């Protein structure tokens, strides 16, 4: 006779097995109507699953994160239901949940068009509005296989043959005449699945293997209510306006082309942003006492075999050969930094040694995964490695954390989610070493008053790590910063120092990245600011323009003064109407426009306008220069008078 303990500690006694739905109904009809699933003894189960022993139970509704995920998963099944009605010969592969939605990989005898997607979405809505019950049946492996063989679902049969044990009991979910297989849980009724939209299609190889057949992947988004769906679609619309690829072209920052996939051709203005970002990072390296080094971008394969990268990472590495030797173009900087550390005998007095590099790295990313500046093959890491003793780890991690927040705040990123990944099952190093390392990371976060969550077992085999994920103005997550302890690489590459006891010891290595890659971070900044870069990093900070030819000499003189003051400035002396010039430079997101007419020439002043259309009136030239220098020097996010 099960006793069910609820989250508030109250208990309900039953004289027979019950389901989460039964318990919800016992509490009240309102809760029963809202019930999507249950969490029994910490495990998610369907609303209909029996509870036969004393258990803890949480009712899952659409307000819960798990509830929303279940809705999305059930919408994938709804897609399967609809597509089989429209094109009965479709073979269904897999349909998991992803961020903000779901997808289904399907094998179809024609390429889906936008008209097909519209028809599919319409049929999904028609089916969902029937509010039919979803029926779950646990069956034997053999019965499940027979079901899908009869239906010609070869991919489901393959999953059963290769991924599910013969003594397992797969869950079959019946959507009227359509049957899908899943661990679940799923919604009990399709009334929960009314707020969705199909978004796009893409190609995807079965099981991610390019030797297998290319399937069509249909992406969708799903939400608990109409308001949340509309808000998400509005965010997507705003994101499309901010797309760094579109703005990059509009502002002439960079381009990419077929002959160099995933490689950036930086134009003058984009390269100006890149170099300003480098200058900013360099200023922080100096402040936090780092050395800056530069390693070769290509090293012998033998070295990468020593590090373990060749065994674990070779598919992502570009290689070349010369004089019967094979070389790898570096995908990361760390092995090169150990080589620099190894030059000359090191003492404990030399530690900590902080080594930074703007490392030019290359990774052989799949062509289908490339995306503007966000996913490239050639990129520049703001990478650093700290060699230290075990006793120095906590202080060094502390400094890394301060540096991360210091740099992110410069760009206005305030929402940062922090996760601490702990020891995986397969690892090197003693439990004592891991205990200390994990404690050092946790204490460093606590000392900086930073809330964090643990990712148990998600650390690398060679050490625990902290991940920093920043959220932009559209609440999109970007994982950029990492502080990773490494007990393995220094040992593999024979790094050592002479300790206080006059014996050789292996240093702890801390991998530290803040921006991640400069290319990707510029993409993030472009979308965060919609191309309205803060003045200090804007490619052109000021345009000086005349109204008639009679002010040309004054404009040139003023331009020289601004250049001498360290301000990036252009003169626009074209024979165009002043309104045309202002509009053009406003569209180019130039922070300031200085207009010179006869009145300004006579008074030795300029009329100042911002790219947001604000007229700051007439100002002395010296005052303008002083204010601009202050804004640039302080790396302010605000313009004058804001």
Swiss-Prot record:
GO terms for biological process: threonyl-tRNA aminoacylation. It holds the Pfam family HGTP_anticodon. It catalyses: tRNA(Thr) + L-threonine + ATP = L-threonyl-tRNA(Thr) + AMP + diphosphate + H(+). PROSITE patterns: AA_TRNA_LIGASE_II, TGS. Residues 1-61 form the TGS domain. Zn(2+) binds at residues 334, 385, 511. The keyword Cytoplasm applies. Transmembrane segments: none annotated. One of its GO terms (molecular function) is metal ion binding. Keywords: Aminoacyl-tRNA synthetase, ATP-binding, Cytoplasm, Ligase, Metal-binding, Nucleotide-binding, Protein biosynthesis, RNA-binding, tRNA-binding, Zinc. The keyword Nucleotide-binding applies. Its main location: cytoplasm. One of its GO terms (cellular component) is cytosol. Residues 243-534 are annotated as: Catalytic. Binds 1 zinc ion per subunit. It comes from the Bacteria. It is found in: Cytoplasm. Belongs to the class-II aminoacyl-tRNA synthetase family. This is Threonine--tRNA ligase.
């Amino acid at each position: 006779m099960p006793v069910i303990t609820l989250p508030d500690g109250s208990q309900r006694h039953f004289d027979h097995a019950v389901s989460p739905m039964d318990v919800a109904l016992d509490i009240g009809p309102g809760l029963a109507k809202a019930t999507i699933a249950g969490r029994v003894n910490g495990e998610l189960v369907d609303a209909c699953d029996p509870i036969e022993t004393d258990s803890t139970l949480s009712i899952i509704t659409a307000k819960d994160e798990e509830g929303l995920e279940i809705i999305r998963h059930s919408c994938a099944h709804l897609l399967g239901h609809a597509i089989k009605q429209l094109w009965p010969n479709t073979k269904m592969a897999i349909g998991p949940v992803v961020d903000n939605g779901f997808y289904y990989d399907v094998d179809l005898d024609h390429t889906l068009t936008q008209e097909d997607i519209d028809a599919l979405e319409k049929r999904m809505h028609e089916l969902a509005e029937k509010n039919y019950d979803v029926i779950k049946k646990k069956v034997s492996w053999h019965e499940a296989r027979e079901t899908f063989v009869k239906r010609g679902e070869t991919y489901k049969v393959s999953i059963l043959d290769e991924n599910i044990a013969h003594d397992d009991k797969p869950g079959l979910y019946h959507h009227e005449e359509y049957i899908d297989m899943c661990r679940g849980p799923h919604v009990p009724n399709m009334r929960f699945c009314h707020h969705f939209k199909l978004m796009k299609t893409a190609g995807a190889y079965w099981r991610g293997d390019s030797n297998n057949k290319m399937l069509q992947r249909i992406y969708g988004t799903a939400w608990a209510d109409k308001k949340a769906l509309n808000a998400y679609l509005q965010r997507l619309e705003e994101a499309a306006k901010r797309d760094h690829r579109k703005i990059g072209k509009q502002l002439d920052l960079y381009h990419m082309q077929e002959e160099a996939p995933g490689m950036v051709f930086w134009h003058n203005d984009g390269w100006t942003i890149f170099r300003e970002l480098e200058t900013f990072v360099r200023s922080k390296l100096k402040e936090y006492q780092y050395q800056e080094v530069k390693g070769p971008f290509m090293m012998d394969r033998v070295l990468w075999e020593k590090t373990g990268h060749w065994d674990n990472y070779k598919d992502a590495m570009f290689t070349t050969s010369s004089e019967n030797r094979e070389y790898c173009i570096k995908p990361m900087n760390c092995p090169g930094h150990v080589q620099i550390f190894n030059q000359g005998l090191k003492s404990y007095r030399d530690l900590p040694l902080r080594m930074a590099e703007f490392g030019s790295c290359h990774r052989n990313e799949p062509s289908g995964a490339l995306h503007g500046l966000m996913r490239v093959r050639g990129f520049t890491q703001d990478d650093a490695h700290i060699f230290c003793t075990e006793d120095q780890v906590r202080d060094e991690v502390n400094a890394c954390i301060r540096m991360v927040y210091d740099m992110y705040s410069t760009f206005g990123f305030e929402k940062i989610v922090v996760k601490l990944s702990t020891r995986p099952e397969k690892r090197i190093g003693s439990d004592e070493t891991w205990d200390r390392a994990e404690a050092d990371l946790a204490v460093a976060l606590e000392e900086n008053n930073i809330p964090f969550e643990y990712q148990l077992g998600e650390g690398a085999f060679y050490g625990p790590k902290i991940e920093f994920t920043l959220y932009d103005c559209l609440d999109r997550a970007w994982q950029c910063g990492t502080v990773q302890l490494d007990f393995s690489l220094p040992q593999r590459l024979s790094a050592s120092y002479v300790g206080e006891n006059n014996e050789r010891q292996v240093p702890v290595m801390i991998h530290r990245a803040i921006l991640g890659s400069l290319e990707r971070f510029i993409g993030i900044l472009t979308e965060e600011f919609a191309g309205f870069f803060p003045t200090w990093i804007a490619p052109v900070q000021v345009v000086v323009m005349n109204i008639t030819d009679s002010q040309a000499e004054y404009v040139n003189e003023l331009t020289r003064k601004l250049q001498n003051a360290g301000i990036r400035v252009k003169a626009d002396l074209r024979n165009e109407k002043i309104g045309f010039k202002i509009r053009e430079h406003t569209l180019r997101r130039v922070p300031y426009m200085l207009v010179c007419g006869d009145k300004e020439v006579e008074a030795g002043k300029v009329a100042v306008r911002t790219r947001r259309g604000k007229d700051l009136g007439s100002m002395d030239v010296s005052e303008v220069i002083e204010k601009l220098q202050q804004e640039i020097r302080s790396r302010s996010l605000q313009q004058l008078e804001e």
